[in-house]
Amino acid sequence: MGKTLIYLIGFPGSGKFTTAKELCKIIGAVIASNNLFNNIIFDIVKLQNAEVPDDLWEKIFAVRENVLAILEKHYVKSKHYIFTNELIEGDPYDQRLYNSVVNLSKKMDMEIFSVVLHCNNEKLVRRVQSEERYQENKITDPDFAIKKIEGKRLFIPEGSLEIDNSNLSAKEVAKKIVEEMKKEKNGKLIKTSVTNHLKTERTRG
């Protein structure tokens, strides 16, 4: 199986990072979660369960770009890579995040395989309150989490694998992803391109 950049997309509490860890038990992979970049800043300013100002998001994006530039030159060629993000349809900041990962996959000469995780609100509320999320400086306030995603839809890249994991374990989801990767290993993954057609106004919380 050729090396792949797996892009896990979902709302807070949908199980992106937990699924990524389960994937690492099946395939040799390196996780580059959104919190890897965000917590460089969030660990200093402590904005858990709070709105993040736009200017701070821009500084986080600058940190991210520098880390990706390092990764481009020094990535482990024998490993798959797993990225995670909450990408909102119509959000220009999230468009930039997505485009940066697409561009990185091209520079690393890896196919990009997007997986969108869907989860009902009842399970999101339950999952978002976990102790593990608190330790990782993630959103843990269920009311804030639901308000943050209210009226928003996930961005679904062309060719994405969509999984409703409301009643699935992370291990089951990881197995589904690997099975799909094996089906597509002979160059059948849909080529993912940079997007430039989203709205200009910002909708990110």
Model-derived segments and spans:
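Conserved phosphate-donor/acceptor-positioning beta-strand/loop module used by diverse small-molecule
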Residues: 106-128
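Walker A/P-loop
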Residues: 17
